[in-house]
Amino acid sequence: MEIGSAGPVGAQPLLMVPRRPGYGTMGKPTKLLANCFQVEIPKIDVYLYEVDIKPDKCPRRVNREVVDSMVQHFKVTIFGDRRPVYDGKRSLYTANPLPVATTGVDLDATLPGEGGKDRPFKVSIKFVSRVSWHLLHEVLTGRTLPEPLELDKPISTNPVHAVDVVLRHLPSMKYTPVGRSFFSAPEGYDHPLGGGREVWFGFHQSVRPAMWKMMLNIDVSATAFYKAQPVIQFMCEVLDIHNIDEQPRPLTDSHRVKSTKEIKGLKVEVTHCGTMRRKYRVCNVTRRPASHQTFPLQLENGQTVERTVAQYFREKYTLQLKYPHLPCLQVGQEQKHTYLPLEVCNIVAGQRCIKKLTDNQTSTMIKATARSAPDRQEEISRLVRSANYETDPFVQEFQFKVRDEMAHVTGRVLPAPMLQYGGRNRTVATPSHGVWDMRGKQFHTGVEIEMWAIACFATQRQCREEILKGFTDQLRKISKDAGMPIQGQPCFCKYAQGADSVEPMFRHLKNTYSGLQLIIVILPGKTPVYAEVKRVGDTLLGMATQCVQVKNVIKTSPQTLSNLCLKINVKLGGINNILVPHQRPSVFQQPVIFLGADVTHPPAGDGKKPSIAAVVGSMDAHPSRYCATVRVQRPRQEIIQDLASMVRELLIQFYKSTRFKPTRIIFYRDGVSEGQFRQVLYYELLAIREACISLEKDYQPGITYIVVQKRHHTRLFCADRTERVGRSGNIPAGTTVDTDITHPYEFDFYLCSHAGIQGTSRPSHYHVLWDDNCFTADELQLLTYQPSAHTYVHCTRSVSIPAPAYYAHLVAFRARYHLVDKERDSAEGSHVSGQSNGRDPQALAKAAQIHQDTLRTMYFA
């Protein structure tokens, strides 16, 4: 993959992504199956045409119907027996050339419209180029290097795109496409999520260039859709009303606001016009009920009179509204004042829910979709058999053959590291299947807590004083056993109410108790208090806080208290464990800094809230301690805009902590999709270099830039049943794959560094986009597994992505709480998307700024 210049041609040198340095050999070999299916492709040229449809900006579904109608209509004169495939946007491929002039051809097409009228379209088709699948074979076998393999260009001459379009054409016509997945309405099953939403099951399908061959990645998929039902019923679900007949009065303001939030933007169809089911998009819910909501009605004599919606429906349709006391939907454009009573509207089928699911809905979704690895393996195999690619006329047209057996892959299970604890015995723990026990062990470096406070935001009735006393006694016992002694009783223990009392209470504590190390905050469930505690503690006053849910105070368990101690120790500067020094990889022989970076974006459809970029850096030689830096930036921007200054801050902090300058920088970048690789690498690699040079003119540490991807659909299964681990039958922690299903020539690998508890384990995909340090495959895979996955402070388990990338995600997520505007926070609890609308960039930047006393700690743990 070549990385071109962002400026004028030749202004910057090309950046070349490193080729694979060889294959890993370390670890115990294991036989695996991957949900990748080989696609045999002929060595032929296919023909690419650019399609332009007017009117434009139609959904892909409509574009597909237009092109399908056009192909049928011009079958005799143009298309003959050819079966073209189309990507729904601009690219159409044929196996044989079309008889059209080089200048192109303009054609007419129609689709049936509402009310019996046809919708006319103009379609222009123009030849672009031949696309060579022979060249693709050359690339896959390593005989030639291609242009970047991208799937996102509007008109792509990339042969991979052509393969993808062929295999997606028929499913796109049969099912509801969402991204790279296909869904169909539930038949024979029902998985309601509540709130008018339900689970739809489907399958993911994408083509991947792999070693020597093309692979088709197939996986089961699920997402939330809105239930097709009467709007009245939808409103009842949203507002938790069991029977609308029990709602004789108009909706309250809070009910109206809640229902507006849920239904705005959805399509509804009317039921009062017989078979003519006209569709509208909802823009609002009226304040007034149908019996009082008026609009200007023009009579036949030209006179305009005011009519209520209820009157109009009675006069025009002889329809006496059953619920005139309920509001109306305002549909179409707001300025046009088109109102529909709720009772004549249905939610249109097939609308995906892009809004954030509630906690309960997320929990229901996980339960409905979690499958053990063997079950998922069987379901994927069934999906491939039922797809019946050998009978797909478009697959046949282009002479493809899709094998229906999963790819056989040889993986390796990397050895787990030995972890050093502290205390007199300096005990060593060896993880088994990604898990180890801390019982009988003490933190490597435990903190002594001499002054601490408790703020209880649960009511005294919920959490009585004797319960608090029991909790603190047990916490002190567990913490002492863990080598983090908490001395005496808390210097302050008071009840409080509401988010407004957080800041004055914390200020009082800071001013009254010099040397206060920790405030333990007890929360009464999901509440805005949490966001305010973190805002005040992290950004305003620089105080360490640890929140605990009241249910865990009332019913304590050694496990919960032990997990609390893991967090508290590192927040106060302690170290939980380290890799046994003699086992550390050779990269640690010189100063090395591990950086993790992530950008979190606001929920879909919310363009006003900012994206948040976070970078963390290791601050010791273990690496165990980390510092963080965070910035707000333009919504939905993936490149970290201020990366140079963020990395500079962390390099300075590393030097202050260790008195060394790193000779190597290992940069784990989360959240980047393949289509963004070139752009993000080009900008961010230069930013890291700029940070180094800004500190010292000749300072050029070796940089290794690795993208960590979790949002993919590759799954690995044990070929040998006896090697399955746990109740879910997953692959062992440490399983790595860098052959067969990986990139034909670039440096990438899959690593499952954690033990799957529920459902099927998802291995992380690592793609090395830059490597000054010339790591071997073994070195980088071991570095990613041993120190990076086993030093995450929240638990005594190895985690699914490297600790620095995980911490960056936590920092960005915490910053969302810092941006919550407490005055406008909803009663639903700390809604992490924030309430930052309308605040200027300077105010947002200031709100996200961490207090100087907190900055050097792992406050985000």
From Swiss-Prot:
Enzyme Commission identifier(s): 3.1.26.n2
SMART domains: DUF1785 (SM01163), PAZ (SM00949), Piwi (SM00950)
Disulphide linkage map: none
CDD domains: PAZ_argonaute_like (cd02846), Piwi_ago-like (cd04657)
Pfam families: ArgoL1 (PF08699), ArgoL2 (PF16488), ArgoMid (PF16487), ArgoN (PF16486), PAZ (PF02170), Piwi (PF02171)
PTM per Swiss-Prot/TrEMBL: Ubiquitinated on surface-exposed lysines by a SCF-like E3 ubiquitin-protein ligase complex containing ZSWIM8 during target-directed microRNA degradation (TDMD), a process that mediates degradation of microRNAs (miRNAs). Ubiquitination by the SCF-like E3 ubiquitin-protein ligase complex containing ZSWIM8 leads to its subsequent degradation, thereby exposing miRNAs for degradation. ZSWIM8 recognizes and binds AGO3 when it is engaged with a TDMD target.
GO molecular function, one term: single-stranded RNA binding
BP terms from Gene Ontology: miRNA-mediated gene silencing by inhibition of translation; mRNA catabolic process; pre-miRNA processing; regulation of stem cell proliferation; regulatory ncRNA-mediated post-transcriptional gene silencing
Domain spans labelled PAZ: 230-349
List of residues that carry N-acetylmethionine: M1
Region (Interaction with guide RNA): 530-567, 758-806
Catalytically driven reaction(s): Endonucleolytic cleavage to 5'-phosphomonoester
Start and end residues of each stretch annotated as Disordered: 824-847
Sorted UniProt keywords: Acetylation, Cytoplasm, Endonuclease, Hydrolase, Metal-binding, Nuclease, Phosphoprotein, Ribonucleoprotein, RNA-binding, RNA-mediated gene silencing, Translation regulation, Ubl conjugation
Record text on subunit structure and interactions: Interacts with EIF4B, IMP8, PRMT5 and TNRC6B. Interacts with APOBEC3F, APOBEC3G and APOBEC3H. Interacts with EDC4.
Family the entry assigns: Belongs to the argonaute family. Ago subfamily.
Protein name, per record: Protein argonaute-3
Provenance organism: Bos taurus
